């Protein structure tokens, strides 16, 4: 399978299908540090990133925000002292789409730059 971090998001329409269990088994190994959670009956990808201080956490938050704006796909972001929690899901379909796995992989790449 193509590296998720090099892929582009596609426009997600309300009638788009959520990823299947088979697709999750195929995609999740590329973003192994992301947990699949369920909140308000909606499956999401979530990861907590650790940093040495608030300034580093805020810098990562801003980079994640810029990435989201560029892709037109936006996560929930919680910035705290020394950590940032990023949660991806597709609002229009109330669940996980391939775009969420792509954006999780791209978010991971921010740590490498």
From Swiss-Prot:
Q: Name one GO molecular function term.
A: 4-alpha-hydroxytetrahydrobiopterin dehydratase activity
Keyword Acetylation found = no
GO BP term, pick one = tetrahydrobiopterin biosynthetic process
Among InterPro entries, the record links this protein to: PCD_sf (IPR036428), Pterin-4-alpha-carb_dehyd (IPR050376), Pterin_deHydtase (IPR001533)
Q: Membrane-crossing residues? A: none
* Reactions that this protein is recorded to catalyse: (4aS,6R)-4a-hydroxy-L-erythro-5,6,7,8-tetrahydrobiopterin = (6R)-L-erythro-6,7-dihydrobiopterin + H2O
Enzyme Commission number(s) from the entry: 4.2.1.96
* Keywords, in A-Z order: Lyase
Keyword field contains Cell membrane: no
Q: Which Pfam families match?
A: Pterin_4a
Q: Which family does it belong to?
A: Belongs to the pterin-4-alpha-carbinolamine dehydratase family.
Among PANTHER family, the record links this protein to: PTERIN-4-ALPHA-CARBINOLAMINE DEHYDRATASE-RELATED
Q: Which HAMAP family does this one have?
A: Pterin_4_alpha
The name on file for this protein is Putative pterin-4-alpha-carbinolamine dehydratase
- Origin organism is Nitrosococcus oceani (strain ATCC 19707 / BCRC 17464 / JCM 30415 / NCIMB 11848 / C-107)
